[in-house]
């Protein structure tokens, strides 16, 4: 929710020297800017979306994890500002790149956004500046993509300017503040690493330096592939448990009582967000350059990508058995479309794919999400939560603001893909669980 303040917008970006400029005012850039600014650094956010820039300069945050009440005083004091003018980068001591690294339609790395930004930086690069890439990517990106562009200016990394990679570790909607999460840093040279570590160390509690940008790049991929593989394991187990008539949630909870040798992961309708569904493909693509096939990682990706299809089948079974209805013509409410609880981000959300599959099967689909007012690409807006109007309510994202016990009482049929209904759902003949 954007909280509006009365802080006036400056007519233009103040002309000054900035400690840090961050290219990309999104889910990574804004929390990072907030962290540096609250630590006493002067910060400039650079973004091509003028509406975002204007809002930030009024002290209005479009990122839920950084409330406007915290942002506005920093703007008013001149510690933080925003601009769409890349020329302002000339006045920054350090330039951090926090831009998306999506996949192409062919599910291959798309670095076009960060490459374009690096070219803009190169036009303004001066001696003594530090450039750090934060965007998640494959090992070799900093050295193979950014370094040649920046050195085409005639300046040399490690001598005239510094270049490093430090992966973002933002977890939207979580209790983890940016300054509390250790920062991994790997520079082109030791001097590059040292300069980057000094910058991050001024605002973040712990900095861990590795030997190269490649090591830092692979660190981030390992973190997210670890989650992808383990989630795939429990997703596959959930499908087997469905056939065996065993409650997978009960099994996972029981296994989690072991105090060693087990980490609990929960099944669900698929992966979502800007990292976990995307990152494995970055590594598998790069691995092919070395004649290596990451079979285990790719299999996990296939299992997770198949989950919306399994969930569609589960909804169909529930309608057939509980209401003697087919999917075609049924009224279905999807509850929660953000990719994780209590945030507004729908990037790569499995809810979007599930809605598409349900529509293709002839269902009339609506959704309710207290954090996501609309999904323009699907032509949908969030509807009031009135479960009794629908043949089936499907819980896709378990936002904490929903009373799930009341939901069960008011619904004819609930398909619970997140175990949000807990014991009440287990004991109710109206609830089907993943």
Predicted regions and their residues:
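Structural/interface elements that position substrates and couple domains in central-metabolism enzymes
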Residues: 2-434
């Amino acid at each position: 929710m954007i909280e509006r303040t009365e802080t006036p917008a400056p007519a233009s970006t103040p002309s000054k020297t900035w400690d840090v400029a961050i290219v990309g005012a999104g889910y990574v850039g804004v929390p990072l800017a907030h962290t540096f600014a609250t630590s006493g650094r002067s910060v400039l956010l650079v973004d091509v979306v003028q509406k975002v820039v204007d809002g930030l300069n009024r002290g209005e945050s479009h990122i839920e994890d950084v409330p406007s009440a915290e942002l506005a005083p920093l703007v008013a004091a001149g510690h933080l500002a925003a601009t769409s003018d890349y020329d302002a980068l000339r006045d920054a001591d350090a330039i951090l790149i926090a831009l998306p690294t999506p996949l192409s339609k062919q599910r291959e790395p798309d670095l076009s956004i960060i490459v374009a930004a690096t070219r803009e930086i190169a036009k303004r690069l001066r001696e003594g500046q530090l450039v750090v890439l934060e965007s998640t990517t494959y090992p070799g990106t900093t050295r193979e993509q950014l370094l040649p562009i920046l050195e085409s200016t005639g300046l040399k990394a490690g001598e005239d300017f510094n270049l490093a990679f430090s992966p973002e570790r933002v977890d939207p909607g979580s209790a983890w503040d940016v300054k509390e999460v250790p920062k991994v840093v790997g520079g082109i040279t030791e001097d590059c690493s040292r300069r980057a570590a000094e910058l991050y160390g001024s605002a973040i509690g712990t900095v861990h330096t590795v030997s190269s940008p490649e090591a830092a790049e692979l660190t981030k991929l390992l973190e997210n592939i670890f989650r992808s593989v383990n989630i795939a394991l429990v997703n596959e187990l959930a499908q087997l448990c469905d056939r065996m008539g065993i409650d997978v949630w009960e099994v996972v909870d029981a296994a989690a009582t072991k105090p060693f040798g087990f980490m609990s992961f929960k099944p669900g309708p698929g992966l979502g967000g800007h990292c976990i569904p995307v990152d494995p493909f970055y590594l598998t693509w790069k691995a092919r350059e070395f004649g290596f096939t990451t079979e285990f990682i790719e299999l996990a990706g296939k299992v997770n990508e198949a989950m919306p299809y399994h969930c569609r089948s589960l909804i169909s079974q529930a309608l057939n058995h509980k209401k003697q209805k087919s999917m075609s013509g049924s009224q279905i409410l999807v509850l929660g479309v953000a990719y994780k609880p209590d945030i507004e981000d729908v990037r790569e959300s499995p809810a979007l794919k599930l809605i598409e599959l349900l529509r293709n099967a002839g269902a009339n689909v609506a959704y309710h999400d207290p954090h996501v007012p609309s999904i323009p690409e699907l032509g949908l807006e969030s509807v009031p939560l009135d479960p009794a109007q629908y043949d089936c309510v499907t819980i896709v994202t378990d936002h904490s603001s929903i009373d799930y016990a009341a939901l069960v009482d008011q619904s004819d049929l609930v398909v619970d893909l997140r175990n949000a209904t807990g014991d009440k759902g287990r004991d109710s003949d109206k609830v089907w669980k993943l």
